[in-house]
């Protein structure tokens, strides 16, 4: 699955990693890029799956590093294979490439930053593995991978690849994150402070979401808030 990854893994000690297919990149990345650049002031690395020529041209013009790949149909044996493959690939890429000294924030491309973290929050996020706990899960939406757990990160990457190839498991990324890291020390990114994992159904939900550092609407049930940031807004 990784023999055809093209591009170079960044050497920054701290950066933000996101991964998506071409459709999500086109729809959500301008907002992701604009808000994380404005509030977090960190390098961004994009891994794009099955990119179009237009997306590649855009990446070349942006202040990002990137890798990309074309999907091998041999790994898509099951009805949900492509969805789980896209969800898990950032953790698989990260697990095989995380360098000594790196602390990498992993964020969904349809998330966006609302405000800058304070120094205590930055320390909580970057000093160790860090996850938000919700409904007994370690959430994949926004988390931090620390070089102190490079061995476990690679083990998680291998497990995810095996599950995608051998089963019709949905939510491979969160399943393996819990199996791999739950019993080891990690920093807790407090729910409703960092991010909110409840559905957005009412104006009160929007209000509570807007209090967090990161805004994210769950799955296809949410995403009611229009994406107002366009490619023109980031200079393309």
Model feature map: region roles:
Residues 1-76, 99-100, 151, 208, ...:
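N-terminal anchoring/stem segment of glycosyltransferases
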Residues 131-144, 168-169:
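A recurrent flexible, glycine/aromatic-enriched loop bordering the glycosyltransferase active site
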Residues 64-70, 105, 128-131, 188:
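Short hydrophobic/aromatic-enriched beta-strand-loop microsegments
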Residues 86-137:
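GT-A fold catalytic core of metal-dependent nucleotide-sugar glycosyltransferases
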Residues 25, 78-88:
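A short, glycine-/small-residue-rich helix N-cap motif at loop->alpha-helix starts
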Residues 147-236:
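Catalytic core and acceptor-binding pocket of nucleotide-sugar-dependent glycosyltransferases
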Residues 93, 129, 142-144, 176, ...:
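Conserved hydrophobic/aromatic beta-strand scaffold that supports enzyme active sites
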């Amino acid at each position: 699955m990784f023999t055809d990854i093209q591009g170079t893994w960044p050497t920054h000690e701290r950066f933000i990693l996101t991964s998506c297919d071409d459709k999500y990149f086109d729809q959500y990345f301008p907002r992701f890029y604009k808000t994380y650049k404005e509030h977090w002031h960190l390098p961004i690395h994009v891994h794009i799956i099955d990119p179009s020529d237009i997306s590649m041209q855009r990446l070349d013009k942006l202040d990002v590093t990137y890798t990309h790949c074309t999907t091998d149909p041999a790994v898509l044996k099951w009805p949900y294979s492509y969805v789980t493959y896209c969800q898990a690939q950032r953790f698989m890429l990260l697990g095989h490439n995380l360098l000594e000294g790196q602390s990498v924030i992993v964020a969904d491309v349809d998330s966006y930053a609302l405000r800058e973290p304070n120094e205590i929050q930055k320390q909580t996020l970057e000093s160790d593995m860090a996850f938000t706990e919700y409904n007994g899960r370690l959430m994949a939406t926004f988390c931090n991978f620390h070089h102190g757990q490079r061995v476990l990160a690679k083990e998680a990457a291998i497990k995810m690849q095996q599950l995608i190839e051998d089963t019709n498991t949905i939510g491979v990324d969160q399943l393996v994150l819990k199996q791999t890291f739950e019993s080891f020390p990690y920093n807790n990114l407090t729910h409703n402070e960092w991010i909110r994992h409840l559905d957005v159904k009412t104006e009160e939900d929007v209000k509570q979401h807007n209090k967090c550092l990161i805004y994210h609407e769950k799955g296809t049930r949410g995403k009611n808030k229009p994406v107002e940031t366009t490619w023109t807004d980031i200079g393309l």
